[in-house]
Regions:
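Residue-level detector of well-ordered alpha-helical segments, enriched
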Residues: 8, 31, 432, 445, ...
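M16/insulysin-pitrilysin zinc metalloprotease superfamily fold
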Residues: 19, 452-453, 459, 466-478, ...
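Long, charge-enriched, surface-exposed interaction segments in small proteins/subunits
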Residues: 2-4, 33-101
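C-terminal non-catalytic interaction appendages of large macromolecular assemblies
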Residues: 260-265, 303-310, 319-322, 525-589
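Basic, nucleic-acid-interacting segments
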Residues: 99-413, 424, 451
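Strongly charged, low-complexity linkers/loops
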Residues: 475-489, 495-568
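Core structural elements
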Residues: 306-318, 386, 423-447, 456-472, ...
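The catalytic Nudix box helix
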Residues: 9-22
Length: 589
């Protein structure tokens, strides 16, 4: 069998069009032989060059080695092996074939080993205002395309913006809740770039003078609390939305349409410092940030509808180093799971490039949920690329101390405060209290129920075990807290059984009928009359002689089956405790 590790040195030199002397050639032959032997042992796979017809331009290869992504460099040299020490090839993963083809990043804890990840997040939160940031158009989601537009938000010449005071108050509220300094003077600027969904050719944002500076979001992971610092919170208008025809994204689509309904919808952008060190912390940051914004009532927090959007900047550096590495931006992460997976993938990809000696370039990449990979979108812009300058149509924004204090006075308790209170007052365990902390809708429903029903423990049990099994989005919940409280009181009083209660809830959600309607139109009174239950028990015993014989022979577990049969015979209305008592007596008799 031909030993494919024996490479014709003349052909190798000819491939690269290198000029070497005889002595250099002999030295090169010796070094290459040693290297090939090492590579054969390490890779466990034969080594071979591409066919002779595969011409490689030396200058092109050198340019690729300096600038191009590693996959492009690989394409220049064909099916060459992935060897340690070459700056233009991907190092092989454990168990790889050594072909140099792009492979799935290893499943490792991101940031482990010699490198550590440095992550910063930029989060856009859509504010719950009724009108847009600079015009009176409504902000309602789901309207017909381009129905919520006017000359201002569609960028018509001569149309002038007027700032929405409600949006400013919401930005102040967010800043206060996160410990920011509220700047009494802030300035709107034009961020200039071209894109089809940007009708004016620029976006009105804030740059040098944001409305909020500093601040933090406190996270708790593995029972350890950390404060993730914020750089700033600033206000800006949203862009329109591209709708792609024939494909979920722009790639492969037949055409793209623009919907300007979202244009100029008010946003705040929360920019963190690069304090996040792994994907789990990034996810927890987003969980806590969403909980804060929803608790404040300033954002719906729905990532699927685009109410909350997150971009991540990630870089790697050697562990213990203080200098930041070249950052890569990741976009198109529309869920908490996507944020965690995208960061894990990208950190591993960057680690592979570091180990291969491949230069990392500043770029923007898109997360693809279907392939679970990131893909190059464009080279990352710097702030000067946007040519920021103060918007001449808007005066500087001045926020008075009185305005700030009036907003502060209306702040509700924050999620962590709520968690601590629930653990203290209701003796909830950590996981139960956390569910209320990260889901403000659950907490609001719970608090309303407590106004009518005082058993917090039983309320939480029914809330988590039954109500949430039917609907976990309390914005869509058609069961009111008042109805749910009365429903639980009927169970506590024995008017209806727990089994009946579960069936009533199931029908309420299946038929989308209010609880009080079902309770009012049907007889749900629990059967507690002993004579009626004895009659039902006698019928069941007569109908199930086999199970009765099993019970009397010592197989007492069959009692549960017989209790269920009695409950079925009475339409779930019989008192379960009394059924159990009567059955036991009659089976022993």
């Amino acid at each position: 069998m031909e030993d494919k590790t024996q490479i014709n040195i003349d052909r190798l030199i000819d491939l690269g069009s290198f000029e070497v002397t005889g002595a250099e050639k002999r030295q090169f032959e010796g070094e290459l032989a040693d290297f090939l032997e090492y590579a054969r042992v390490i890779n466990g796979a034969p080594l071979h060059l591409p066919p002779a017809s595969h011409a490689v331009d030396k200058e092109q290869l050198l340019r690729a080695d300096e600038a191009a992504p590693w996959k492009e460099r690989e394409a220049l040299i064909g099916n060459a092996p992935a060897l340690q020490g070459t700056s233009y090839l991907v190092p092989p993963l454990a168990g790889s074939s050594g072909t140099g083809k792009e492979q799935e990043p290893r499943t490792v804890k991101p940031g482990s080993g010699d490198y550590e990840a440095v992550i910063g997040l930029e989060v856009h939160a859509q504010l719950n205002t009724s009108t847009k940031l600079f015009c009176p158009c409504p902000t309602s989601f789901g309207s017909d395309p381009n129905s919520n537009t006017c000359p201002v938000c569609s960028g018509q010449p001569g149309a002038l913006p007027v700032l929405n005071r409600e949006a400013v108050s919401m930005a102040i509220k967010a800043g206060l809740a996160m410990g920011c300094t509220i700047n009494e003077r802030s300035l709107f600027a034009r961020k200039n770039y071209f894109y089809p969904d940007l009708p004016k050719g620029y976006q009105i944002s804030q740059f040098e003078e944001p409305i909020c500076s500093g601040g933090f979001v406190e996270i708790e992971l593995d029972k350890t609390k950390r404060k993730i610092r914020l750089n700033r919170i600033h206000m800006e208008e949203d862009a329109g939305k591209l709708v792609h025809v024939g494909a979920p994204g722009i790639w492969g689509s037949k055409a793209s349409a623009v919907d300007y309904n979202r244009s100029s919808v008010p946003l705040i952008e929360i920019v963190s410092e690069p304090d996040i060190s792994n994907p789990a912390e990034a996810r927890e940051f987003m969980v806590m940030l969403r909980a804060i914004l929803v608790t404040l009532g300033i954002c719906n927090g729905n990532m699927e509808e685009g109410n909350l959007r997150c971009d991540a900047n990630v870089s790697l550096r050697e562990r213990g180093d203080t200098e930041l590495g070249v950052k890569v931006e990741i976009k198109n992460m529309n869920s908490l799971k996507a944020i965690e997976r995208a960061l894990a993938y990208e950190i591993t990809r960057l680690e592979q490039m570091k180990r291969a000696g491949t230069p990392i370039e500043q770029e923007t990449r898109l997360w693809d949920d279907s392939s679970q990979k990131t893909a190059l979108m464009r080279s990352k812009e710097e702030s000067h690329d946007y040519r920021y300058f103060p918007d001449p149509d808007l005066l500087p924004l001045h926020v008075t101390g009185e305005w700030i204090e009036s907003v502060r006075a209306a702040l509700p308790p924050m999620p962590l405060e709520r968690k601590n209170r629930y653990e203290r007052e209701f003796s909830f365990n950590e996981s139960e209290a956390r569910l209320f902390m990260v889901n403000p809708g659950y907490a609001a429903f719970f608090e309303k129920c407590l106004e009518h029903y005082g058993n917090a423990r039983n309320l939480a049990n029914w809330l988590f075990s039954e109500l949430l099994s039917h609907e976990d989005d309390f914005d869509r919940l058609h069961v009111t807290p008042e109805d749910f409280a009365k429903f639980l009181m009927k169970i506590d009083s024995g008017e209806i059984s727990g089994r009946q209660g579960k069936d009533i809830l199931r029908r309420a959600f299946a038929d989308k009928v209010a609880l009080h309607e079902i309770l009012g139109r049907e007889d749900h009174a629990q059967i507690t009359d002993r004579a009626s239950i004895e009659k039902a028990v006698d019928t069941v015993i007569a109908a199930h002689p086999g199970q009765v014989a099993e019970y009397r022979s010592g197989k007492t577990r069959v009692l549960g089956y017989l209790v269920g049969a009695v409950m079925k015979a009475t339409g779930g209305k019989a008192n379960p405790g009394l059924v159990n008592e009567v059955l036991t007596e009659k089976l022993k008799g």
